[in-house]
Structure formats: structure tokens, C-alpha cells
From Swiss-Prot:
Domain of life (superkingdom): Eukaryota
Keyword Transmembrane helix among UniProt keywords: no
Highest classification ranks of the organism: Eukaryota, Fungi, Dikarya, Ascomycota, Saccharomycotina
PANTHER family reported in the protein's UniProt record: SYMPLEKIN, SYMPLEKIN-RELATED
Phosphoserine carried by residues: 500
Subunit structure: Component of the cleavage and polyadenylation factor (CPF) complex, which is composed of PTI1, SYC1, SSU72, GLC7, MPE1, REF2, PFS2, PTA1, YSH1/BRR5, SWD2, CFT2/YDH1, YTH1, CFT1/YHH1, FIP1 and PAP1. Component of the APT complex, which is a subcomplex of CPF, and is composed of PTI1, SYC1, SSU72, GLC7, REF2, PTA1 and SWD2.
Source organism per UniProt: Saccharomyces cerevisiae (strain ATCC 204508 / S288c)
GO biological process, one term: termination of RNA polymerase II transcription, poly(A)-coupled
Residue ranges of the region described as Disordered: 487-544
Protein's UniProt name: Pre-tRNA-processing protein PTA1
Keywords: mRNA processing, Nucleus, Phosphoprotein, tRNA processing
Note: Present with 3730 molecules/cell in log phase SD medium.
Described function: Essential in pre-tRNA processing. Component of the cleavage and polyadenylation factor (CPF) complex, which plays a key role in polyadenylation-dependent pre-mRNA 3'-end formation and cooperates with cleavage factors including the CFIA complex and NAB4/CFIB. Component of the APT complex, which may be involved in polyadenylation-independent transcript 3'-end formation.
Length: 785
């Protein structure tokens, strides 16, 4: 039975590929997805997953028979199902196909989110992206994640396993970097197409994430201690695409590549000497090809924008020439021409070094998860139909609207089908309809307003100006016709209304004159008598008192009448709202925090600030005073750790967006964290955690021009430990930013004596890791003597 059903799916796929694939292939995908969720076909889970992922990959790839306008919708529709498969599968092919699908569809879905402002779609895309990136250095799905650092063999076994998935993940990382950075040309999807004030996409956060992912690839080349040749070559090849399409990354990539020492890599456990020599030769060849590619395409030039550009050019040119000579010598001698008895000159790592390597591995994984904003726990599997129901409905409506529009556009050509200057009725649809003489049955009220605005603006921008003016003229003439029709009908209706009003007034006067004992006559008499008796204008309080008395008496009269005719109605019980769940509380807390950030960012120019300093924390004249309250609240006022950490995450993201202008707030926040816990005689764990997070987040953005800012931050932190100074290590090792790191260390030596021992240890580590830093390290060590 299973083979028969799979055979039917294969036949349906073949038939759809050759006959109207635009309409047939999505139906095959829907059928496969429904079969995958069918509990009676549990034995077919793996074959269906393989078939489904391969078909989605064929649909969203560049050479797909599906139109480019349809591919983003199809990719977005099945994001929840792909995430569920990735979390539950143990098959390498299925997981690899999912990663390749992300490579092809991530730019498309990101562009769709930018155009539709769909928060739910973006959340699903981020969940799948985070899951894939969190497993890129593991052997998932072949092995479960290893938590015990002392299990050396289990950790090291993951290094060269599942290479195909790792290479696919590297390709996906490069696609994320390309999609989330600016492009000099407008022919591809990039962050330049995202508005600065987009309601869903945070443009600075996306660009920051792209920089960190690029640094992650470069750091792998530098810090990986084993010769994983396939991964090294994959990263170098991916960097060639990034540096070609994003010239602004040239300095960053070339600086990292200069620190990539092929000779310093150790052979993998259990691999032969010949395997190590071949692996090393392949990596050197890829390195040389990268440099030659950069020179040939005028990427690596003497006129690079950095001051150290000429040195980078000369160093890379020399490395390329040296590698070429080594390759020629190896070719002439023969790579197999060596004495196996002498063994490999490279020694293996000791157990202690292996434990350090695994510890570094775990720290890098934690930093990656922190960058992506996820916890170290595995995400809970999601149910595809429940999560994507609203998204699928909206996508279906957009597809119907798109099909209807394309059909009308193909028939009408350059003229409007309905160009009558008079509308059929006084409805908006008849005024604006230029494609039908009757209702089009397109209910766009089901779509969100932001999507409607985006569709309208895109249509106006792409329309010919002459045709747009013609259409607007037709609509204007219809409005004019409706207005003239209304004006002509107003006089007769208003005169008849006046006549009826006069008749009503006469009847009312008769009732008052007859003194009839009705409720209306009593009420009118009560309202008119005070006006006749008052010789002068009473005070406001007296007038209000009289009005209240009159209202009470009127209510008593009407109440007595109602009691005689009907029973007293029972009072409805008070409304008791449902209590919020924990997730809802955190959601509203996050929204409230963002509103405070918007308020603090708003510049108040209506009132000038007073020159005298005020001791009030919440000052109406200071738009940023809410931040001081928020800092005090998060450090002292919220007992729930989860809620306070959520606000801290928002604070960190807000400060990093403009860290130069907000350095005072950063220092205030961290000092409050330290002071509150130390005043209670507690270990300042919150201060340590979030001060390290601040330094890790600032690392990718710091440049030499930020010297004053960074020295001030480091000098005003209330407590500095070895972990804080460890954040200076990558800055000191970076050739483009080393002066920033050493100037900061010099300042700490001079003005913060308690950290001198820690600085001394850091300088010794820098001397061991980079011989080119000996001179700078020795000059600072001399100050410590």
C-alpha cells in the first residue's frame, strides 16, 4: 500500500512538471502535506518527508517552473511544516533538503515580509533560521547534542561528521548575510529595500545579525584547531561570493583571512598522515584561488578604503605567490613522495587542550544563540496547520486577488473596461471600479491595512503616469456627478423638513397650553419655569445643583411609572475578565517597553528646558526620563526574573542601536544592577551577565573612532573581572582595531590598579597567540613592573 501511494505521488509530480506546473505543483504539495499529517500513514512519514522536501526545493529554486511571483508565497506557506520536520527527523537527506530550501527561499520570504508586514510569517522564518544555525557545528540529525564537556570522544566525533549538511548551512549563512546587508546595485534582495520605520523588520538589528554571522564564519577559520578541510574550503568559497556582491565587507573578510593560519591546524583524530597532507594542500589551493579571484576582479587593490589597505594587499599577494610555489614544488615531487615512518610533524592535542577546545566550542555556540535571540533549549515542535492557518488564509486571498488582477490586465490592455463618468450606484466600489461594470466580489476588507497600503503604493509606483491620470479623472468625474445629484435633491427635502418641524412645534405649544397631566408636559414645565423666574445668571455650582435635582425628579417620575407596569429587572453581575497567561503578560510587557523607547526617542521642541538642574527623575521636559524610570524598575521593581530579563533584552537592543549617544544610559543601567545586588550583600550576578552581554554586543561595531566612548565605558564600569577584559582580546587581535584595544588596556593600567594583574595575564596570552603583537604587549608590560 505504501509503495502504491508513493508511486501515485511520483506520477502526479511528473504529470504536473510537464502540464501546467504553476497550478498543479502546489496541489501536489498540499496533498503530500495532508498525507504527512495523516495519523494512519505513520509508516510513510520518512518517504513522504523526503518526497515533500525535494519537491519544495524544486519549486523554490532558481530554475523552478513556477513563476517568480508565486515562489515566495509557496515557501512561506510551508515554513511551519518544514520546522516540524527539521525538529523531528533523524534522516540526513530530509534535513539537508530543508537547509537547502532555506538557502533558496530565505531572501524571497524576507522580501515578502518587507512588502506585507506579516509578523507571523517573519516569526516562523526566524524560528526555522535559528534552529538551523544552532546545529551548524554539530552532527545533527545523526547525533544528539552532547552536554557533558568531559565526553571528549563524543564531541570530537562531530567535527568531520555530516559534512554535507554543514556545507549547506554555510551556504545558508552566506545567503542570510547577503540578504541582510546593503547592496550597491538594486537588482537583488537586500536590506536597502527595507524602510527604516518598518513595523515588523528592525533594519539595524538585521544588519547587526548579518555582521555577526559573517564574523562567525571568519572566527571559525581562525579558531578551529583541527584540519576540517571540507568546511574550510566551503567557507572560503562562500566568502568569495560575499566579497564580490557586498564590497563593504572587503576589509573585514581580508583581515580575518590574514589571520587564518593553515599550518597551525592539527590533524583529525584517527586520520592518516596522507589524509592530513592532502587536506592541507586542498585548503592552501582554495586560499590561493580566493586571492587570485580578488586580484583578478579588482577586489583586492592597493587603494582599499582602510588605512591598512596597502599592507593587506602586499601580504595577500605574497601569500598567494608562496602558495603557488609550494604547489609547484609538491606537483614536481609528488604528494605521495614522503616517508610514512617519519610520521606527521604536527602533534595531536593533549586532553587538557581538548577540554579547552570543547569549552571554546560551547562558548561560541552560546554566543551564536545569544546573537539569534534564542535560549539553549530546543524549541518546542509546532503544529503546522494550527500555526499557519491565518497565514494560509491571507495567502489564499492574495493569490485570488493576484489571479483576478492578472486576468483583467491581460484583457483590457491600455484602456479601462469601465470608463463611464457616472457611477452605477453611490457606493465606493462603483466609484472606483475601472475593471468591471458590476461588483468584482473581491473582499479586500479581510486583508490587513498595512498590506492594502503596500499593494496600493506598489501599483501606483509601477503604473504609467498617463494611465494613472486617466483613471483618477474618471473617478473624479464620478464624485462630481454624485455631489451634483445630492445638491439638487437637498432643497426640497430641507423645506419639507422645516414644514414638518413647524407642525411639531405647534402641537407642542398646544400641549403646554392645555396643561395636560402627562409626563412630557411636566418635564417641559420643569425645564422652562427656572428660565422664566431667573432675573440674573446664577453661579455655576447652583446651576449644576438644579440640573441634578431636575434629573433626579424626572427619574423618580419615570421610575414610578415603570414600577406599576413591569417588574424590577435584576442587575447583571459585574464583568470579570480572564486572567492573562504568562506568554500574554510578557507580550504586553514587551509592547509597553517599546512604547517607552519610542517616547524617549521623540524630541520635544515645544518647550525649552530649564537651565537649572532638577532632581526629579521623571521630568516632563526631558523625553528620555522614562528610561531612567525603566532602568530603576528593571533593577529593583520587578520580582519575576523572566519579566525583568525581557526588559533587559529590550534595553540592550535599544542601547546598541545608538551606543555612542546612549553611553551614559548604559553606564547608569550597569551601575544600578551592581549597586542593588551588592547593597543586599548578594553576588552581582545580573551585573556580570548583562555587562558581558553589552561588551559582546558592542564588539562587532567598535572601530578606532570609538576610542573615547569605549574607554569611558570600561573606566566607569563598577567592577571589572577577567571575563570583562576577555572581551578586549578579539579587538586587540584584529589588525584594523588593535590600537583601540591597547589604548583601553593602557588606560586601565594607569587609572584602575586593581585590574593590573588581570591585564598582565591578558597581555601574556596575546603575546603567545600573535607574534606580531610582541612590541605593543611589551610596552604595556613594562608599565606594570
Amino acid at each position: 500500500m505504501s509503495s502504491a501511494e508513493m508511486e501515485q505521488l511520483l506520477q502526479a509530480k511528473t504529470l504536473a512538471m510537464h502540464n501546467n506546473p504553476t497550478e498543479m505543483l502546489p496541489k501536489v504539495l498540499e496533498t503530500t502535506a495532508s498525507m504527512y499529517h495523516n495519523g494512519n500513514l505513520s509508516k510513510l512519514k520518512l518517504p513522504l518527508a523526503k518526497f515533500f522536501t525535494q519537491l519544495v526545493l524544486d519549486v523554490v529554486s532558481m530554475d523552478s517552473p513556477i513563476a517568480n511571483t508565486e515562489r515566495p508565497f509557496i515557501a512561506a506557506q510551508y515554513l511551519p511544516l518544514l520546522l516540524a520536520m527539521a525538529q523531528s527527523t533523524a534522516d540526513v537527506l530530509v534535513y539537508k533538503n530543508i537547509v537547502l530550501i532555506m538557502c533558496a527561499s530565505y531572501p524571497l520570504v524576507l522580501d515578502l515580509v518587507a512588502k506585507t508586514s506579516n509578523q507571523e510569517m517573519f516569526d516562523q522564518l526566524c524560528m526555522l533560521k535559528k534552529f538551523v544555525l544552532s546545529h551548524w557545528r554539530t552532527a545533527y540529525p545523526l547525533r544528539a547534542t552532547v552536554d557533558d564537556e568531559t565526553d571528549v570522544e563524543q564531541w570530537l566525533a562531530q567535527i568531520d561528521q555530516n559534512i554535507g549538511v554543514k556545507l549547506a548551512t554555510i551556504k545558508f549563512i552566506s545567503e542570510v548575510v547577503l540578504s541582510q546587508t546593503k547592496s550597491p546595485s538594486g537588482n537583488e534582495i537586500n536590506s536597502s529595500t527595507i524602510p527604516d520605520n518598518h513595523p515588523v523588520l528592525n533594519k539595524p538589528a538585521l544588519e547587526s545579525e548579518a555582521k555577526r554571522l559573517l564574523d562567525m564564519l571568519l572566527n571559525y577559520l581562525i579558531e578551529e584547531q583541527y584540519m576540517v578541510s571540507s568546511v574550510f574550503i566551503g567557507i572560503i568559497n562562500s566568502l568569495s561570493f560575499v566579497i564580490k556582491r557586498r564590497p563593504q565587507t572587503t576589509i573585514r573578510i581580508l583581515s580575518g583571512l590574514l589571520r587564518f593560519n593553515v599550518d597551525a591546524k592539527f590533524p583529525l583524530e584517527g586520520k592518516s598522515d596522507l589524509n592530513y597532507k592532502l587536506s592541507k594542500r586542498f585548503v592552501e589551493r582554495a586560499y590561493k584561488n580566493f586571492v587570485q579571484f580578488g586580484l583578478k576582479n579588482q577586489i583586492i587593490t592597493k587603494s582599499l578604503s582602510s588605512g591598512s589597505g596597502s599592507s593587506i594587499y602586499s601580504k595577500l599577494t605574497k601569500i598567494s605567490q608562496t602558495l603557488h610555489v609550494i604547489g609547484e614544488e609538491t606537483k614536481s615531487k609528488g604528494i605521495l613522495n614522503f616517508d610514512p615512518s617519519k610520521g606527521n610533524s604536527k602533534k595531536t592535542l593533549s586532553r587538557q587542550d581538548k577540554l579547552k577546545y570543547i569549552s571554546l566550542w560551547k562558548r561560541q555556540l552560546s554566543a551564536l544563540l545569544s546573537t539569534l535571540g534564542v535560549s539553549t533549549k530546543t524549541p518546542t515542535p509546532v503544529s503546522a496547520p494550527a500555526t499557519g492557518s491565518s497565514t494560509e488564509n491571507m495567502l489564499d486571498q492574495l493569490k485570488i486577488l493576484q489571479k483576478y488582477t492578472l486576468n483583467k490586465a491581460s484583457h483590457q490592455g491600455n484602456t479601462f473596461f469601465n470608463n463611464s463618468p457616472k457611477p452605477i450606484s453611490n457606493t465606493y466600489s462603483s466609484v472606483y471600479s475601472l475593471m468591471n461594470s458590476s461588483n468584482s466580489n473581491q473582499d479586500v476588507t479581510q486583508l490587513p491595512n498595512d498590506i492594502l497600503i503596500k499593494l496600493s503604493t506598489e501599483a501606483i509606483l509601477q503604473m504609467d503616469s498617463t494611465k494613472l491620470i486617466t483613471g483618477l479623472s474618471i473617478v473624479a468625474s464620478r464624485y462630481t456627478d454624485l455631489m451634483n445629484t445630492y445638491i439638487n435633491s437637498v432643497p426640497s427635502s430641507s423645506s419639507s423638513k422645516r414644514k414638518s418641524d413647524d407642525d411639531d412645534d405647534g402641537n407642542d405649544n398646544e400641549e403646554v397650553g392645555n396643561d395636560g397631566p402627562t409626563a412630557n408636559s411636566k418635564k417641559i414645565k420643569m425645564e422652562t419655569e427656572p428660565l422664566a423666574e431667573e432675573p440674573e445668571e446664577p453661579e455655576d455650582d447652583d446651576r449644576m445643583q438644579k440640573m441634578l435635582q431636575e434629573e433626579e425628579s424626572a427619574q423618580e417620575i419615570s421610575g414610578d411609572a415603570n414600577k406599576s407596569t413591569s417588574a424590577i429587572k435584576e442587575i447583571a453581575p459585574p464583568f470579570e475578565p480572564d486572567s492573562l497567561t504568562q506568554d500574554e503578560k510578557l507580550k504586553y510587557l514587551s509592547k509597553l517597553t517599546k512604547k517607552l523607547f519610542e517616547l524617549s526617542g521623540r524630541q520635544d521642541t515645544t518647550r525649552a528646558k530649564s537651565s537649572s538642574s532638577s532632581s526629579i527623575l521623571l521630568d516632563d521636559d526631558d523625553s528620555s526620563s522614562w528610561l531612567h524610570v525603566l532602568i530603576r524598575l528593571v533593577t529593583r521593581g520587578i520580582e519575576a526574573q523572566e519579566a525583568s530579563d525581557l526588559i533587559r533584552e529590550e534595553l540592550l537592543g535599544f542601547f546598541i542601536q545608538d551606543f555612542e549617544q546612549r553611553v551614559s544610559l548604559i553606564i547608569e543601567w550597569l551601575n544600578e544592577e551592581w549597586f542593588f545586588q551588592t547593597s543586599l550583600h548578594q553576588d552581582p550576578s545580573n551585573y556580570k551577565k548583562w555587562s558581558l552581554r553589552v561588551l559582546e554586543s558592542l564588539g562587532p561595531f567598535l572601530e578606532n573612532k570609538h576610542r573615547r566612548f569605549f574607554i569611558r565605558l570600561m573606566s566607569e564600569l563598577p567592577s571589572l573581572q577577567s571575563d570583562h577584559l576577555e572581551a578586549l582580546k578579539p579587538i586587540c587581535l584584529d589588525p584594523a582595531r588593535s590600537s583601540l584595544g591597547f589604548q583601553t588596556l593602557k588606560f586601565l593600567i594607569m587609572f584602575r590598579p586593581p585590574v593590573q594583574d588581570t591585564v598582565r595575564d591578558l597581555l601574556h596570552q596575546l603575546k603567545q597567540e600573535d607574534e606580531g603583537l610582541h612590541k605593543q604587549c611589551d610596552s604595556l608590560l613594562d608599565r606594570l613592573k
